[in-house]
A protein has these predicted regions:
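Asp-based, Mg2+/Mn2+-dependent phosphohydrolase catalytic module
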Residues: 1-2, 110, 114-286
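Short helix-capping segments at alpha-helix termini
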Residues: 29-34, 59-62, 98, 121-125, ...
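Conserved SAM-binding loop
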Residues: 12, 102-105, 159
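Short, acidic loop-to-helix structural element flanking the phosphoryl-transfer center
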Residues: 76-104, 110, 114, 142
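N-terminal helical cap/lid subdomain that shapes the substrate entry/recognition surface
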Residues: 2-89
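Pocket-edge positions in alpha/beta enzyme catalytic cores
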Residues: 33, 41-45, 76, 80-83, ...
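Conserved functional loop/turn residues at catalytic and ligand-binding sites
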Residues: 9-12, 48, 99, 121, ...
Length: 286
């Protein structure tokens, strides 16, 4: 049995039109700005090195009123324009029939996710839905992926995503699990009190590999590699953001599948992007 985790935008749902309209309506109504092209909007949202608010509106951060306006636009346009990709519902039913634990891990606000999935008719197929909020940081932070794995009875996990942020979250999550396994874990110690070394706002450069080709991930006070010994900083990577025991993650593994039916752009770190048929074959058992 497996845990299968899905990103939402660009993986489950084609929401590119909804996002385009929301951004451009906000530009027009609040700032009197001309519309942006959809491709530019989508690329910016998927780029972990971009400040989307600065790129879209010329400001480094939003006021509460500005955020409220955008979120109202976002929810309304999702309802009207976001649709499941062709073949996704059949894939989800097949996974469910095979007994897999299904989850969503999305950077969309957590309070909007269930309504969006209900609207498309697939909410009932998911065992767990996780979105970003004050306690759960957005990808490329791996916290929501680790949270799903800790809650699932199946510790072999596959994450399907379409963007650089998804890929980096999976890379960081796999690194965390590998280092936890090397160190032997710390049974009974809550991840929520395991340390405060995570740099949740870390930005990634264009090349996230070391000189020897090994994937590297930087945390406050430590830079670890897939070939390096485990460190306390690595073990504390996602500690502050979810309630689980280290024992719940012992022996877990995380694989990433880059998909191509969405609107993201495969990065140079990923394998070739996959079709739904190819994803089904790799997931197996369905």
């Amino acid at each position: 049995m497996k845990t299968v985790i899905f990103d939402m935008d660009g993986t489950l749902l084609d929401s590119s039109r909804a996002i385009e309209i929301s951004v451009n309506n906000t530009r027009r109504e609040l700032y009197g700005l001309a519309p942006l092209q959809k491709n530019f909007i989508v690329r910016t949202i998927n780029d972990p090195n971009k400040n989307a608010f600065l790129e879209f509106y010329g400001k480094t951060e939003a006021s509460a009123e500005e955020l409220a306006f955008f979120e109202k636009e976002f929810v309304s346009n999702y309802r009207d324009f976001a649709v499941l990709y062709e073949g996704i519902e059949d894939l989800l039913h097949s996974c469910k029939k095979a007994g897999f634990f299904l989850a969503v891990a999305s950077n969309a606000p957590s309070y909007t996710l269930s309504a969006i999935l209900e609207k498309t008719g697939v909410r009932r197929l998911f065992d767990l839905v996780v979105g970003a909020n004050e306690q759960m940081p957005s990808k490329p932070n791996p916290a929501m992926l680790l949270h799903v794995i800790a809650r699932s009875p199946h510790k072999n996990a596959i994450f399907l995503g379409d963007s650089k942020k998804d890929e980096l979250a999976a890379l960081r999550g796999a690194e965390f699990l590998q280092n936890l396994e090397f160190q032997g874990g710390n049974d009974g110690k809550s991840l929520s009190s395991c340390g405060e070394n995570l740099n949740a706002d870390e930005k990634f450069g264009p090349d996230d590999t070391g000189a020897d080709g090994a994937a590297t991930l930087s945390f406050k006070g430590a830079k670890i590699s897939a070939k390096a010994e485990a460190t306390e900083s690595a073990q504390a990577a996602a500690a502050r953001y979810f309630q689980a025991n280290l024992a719940d993650l012992r022996g877990a593994k995380l694989e990433y599948l880059q998909v191509c039916w969405g609107f993201g752009e495969p990065s140079k770190l990923s394998r070739n992007a996959l079709s739904i048929a190819q994803a089904r074959e790799i997931i197996g058992g369905i």
